Structures are given as C-alpha cells and as structure tokens.
Amino acid sequence: MKNWLNSDLKDNDIVITTRIRLARNIKGIPFPDKLSDDEGRDVVKKIKDTLIVSNDGKENFTCIDLWKNDNNCNAEYLEKHLISKKLIENYNRSAFILNKDETISVMVNEEDHLRLQAITAGLNLEEAYECIDRIDDKIEENLDYAFDEKIGYLTACPTNIGTGMRASVMIHLPALSMNNEMPRILNALSQIGITIRGLWGEGSKAIGSLYQISNQITLGMSENDIISNLKTVVEQIINQENLSREQLMKKYKYELEDKIARSLGILKNSVILDSNECLNLISNVRMGVEIGIINDISKKSLNNLLVNTQRATLQEIYNKELSKKEENIKRALYVRENLR
C-alpha cells in the first residue's frame, strides 16, 4: 500500500485517503476503560508479543508506548491520522504498533483492546481491507478474540458489534461546499447508514472542504458488503462533485480562477496564518490543481502541508514550544518556504 503523504495521485482523484479499521477485544479481559494502568500495559505487552510472533518478520513493526512520550509527540501521530484522540486520552496504558511505511497502525487500549488500521492513498477500499484482514487473521491465530457466533465480534461500543469494521475515505469536496449542497448530502446519507464527519473525525468540523465518509452499520452485513456499499456511495459523490465543478467553471470561470490565484498568492506571501485559514486556502489551491488551473504544484506537497502546518508537527519542525502567535508566524513561514 502507498503512504498517502508520499503519493502523488491522479490530477482528477479527489479521494485523498482510504482507511479501514477493525475493532477487536481479547476474550476474558475487561475493556480498556475498566483496566488499571498496569493491567493495560500488560495487554500492550501481550499484543506486541503476539504481533511479532504472528508477523514472522514480514513487516518491520515498531511499538510506540504513549506513556513514554510527551503530549506533543503523541499529537503529531494524531495529526498524521495514525492514531485517534481516544488512544491519547488513555495514554497511561495505551500504545500503537506501526509498520515502516506508516500504512498499518495497530492501536492498543483505545476504546477496544485492538483497533487495527490500514490507511492508504486514493480510493482503495479493497486493498486496504485485504491488508488489514491478513494481519487480523494472523493475530487471531495466537489470540482468543471476544466473539459470539450469532452477532460477531464483541466491542466496547454497541455500534461496532458484528464485523467491528469502519471503512472510511477522506474526500475533497470544494464545489459541493461552495454550492451549499453538503447539508442535503449529509441528510441523504444518514438515511442509508453512511455518516459524514470533518477532517479529524467524530465531532470535528469540515475545514478546508475535507470530509470523512464512513459506514455506520457493522451488524448484519459482511465486510465485503460494507465496502461495496461505501464505494458505490463515494463514487456517486465524486460524480456530483465533478458535475458541480463543471457548473462552477461554466458560470463563474473568472471568479473561480481569481479565488484560486488569490489563495495561492496569500499562501506564498503571508506572514501570519492561522490553522483554519491555512486549510481553507490549501483547499482552494488543491481544487486548482485538480481541475488543471495550477500545474506546478503536486498533490503530494499539498498533503504534506495539511499535516506539517498543524500545531504539534510545527513545534516538532521548529523544535520549540510555540505561543499561538508564534505558531501562526511559523506556519506562514513553513508554507512560504515549501511553495517556492
């Protein structure tokens, strides 16, 4: 699988990432929120040892214990979409196991004992599932999962019971956002068991016209059915977005080109940039790349700007704790230097 930060997608590919997560628990052990820190760390060791044995050296895995890191370091992993907010909340007893390419992440003691994640570039639901399913099978050969023959995998939250699978894509929908079509789409999808969230998942706003679209239903459907349904929905949304872009170009060609050019100009010349403004400007430039107005900027560079302009990553890049004002100044500096 391709790392989404290091991959240049096709110009017309508006799906940025595909992610598959599987929720699993070990039979006979209380859910993570019921464990003491010492008990949780015992689970971490158990899963780490199991993954190393089951992996048989095929993947170069590293185990990262969150309790050994500072808050900024853990936040960096969140900004790269390698871990969740819940894993950070449980930092005293949580960890994650990461492969060299940063396409596979096994979170330990999040809401469940295991959250196995595959994340890759573009719309690649089948590839991501095959990859994480293979690792899941290997782990299950050595660990006794909490499983019920009638309903499937048992999870801390009832909404994950069954397959325990969440399939999601991160997609760029600027034209539908500009045309105020997103409320209608959100309402329609909620009626068929699909949910739309912002860039950072549950509870987050859709900044920069970036949305996460995922399945809500995990019970009574097979993994392949979930993937097939989500893929069909995403392809329909892609078609709607492309149609909206065509309409905008026909009706407001010069206004759209001006908006994109001004956004690029601000990014290349600003001295202070807050996070939300930066994401919105990057969105406009990304649209310019996607529709062929801008030809000298890669999607790969824009993907890296998405992550590297976030607070924790900026502090790591400049090796210092930043005040809010300093953060906005350094963000503008970083963008200027990387869009030359």
From Swiss-Prot:
HAMAP family: Prot_Arg_kinase
Residues the record lists as binding ATP: 17-21, 81, 115, 166-170, 197-202
GO molecular function: ATP binding; creatine kinase activity; protein kinase activity
Cited CDD domains: bacterial_phosphagen_kinase (cd07930)
A Pfam family hit: ATP-gua_Ptrans
Family, as annotated: Belongs to the ATP:guanido phosphotransferase family.
Keyword list, A-Z: ATP-binding, Kinase, Nucleotide-binding, Transferase
Gene that specifies this protein: mcsB
Function: Catalyzes the specific phosphorylation of arginine residues in proteins.
InterPro entries from the UniProt entry: Arg_Kinase (IPR023660), ATP-guanido_PTrfase (IPR000749), ATP-guanido_PTrfase_AS (IPR022415), ATP-guanido_PTrfase_cat (IPR022414), Gln_synth/guanido_kin_cat_dom (IPR014746)
Enzyme Commission number(s) of this protein: 2.7.14.1
Enzyme kind, highest EC tier: transferase
GO (cellular component) term, any one: extracellular space
Reaction(s) catalysed (UniProt annotation): L-arginyl-[protein] + ATP = N(omega)-phospho-L-arginyl-[protein] + ADP + H(+)
UniProt xrefs under NCBIfam families: PRK01059.1-4
Name of the featured protein: Protein-arginine kinase
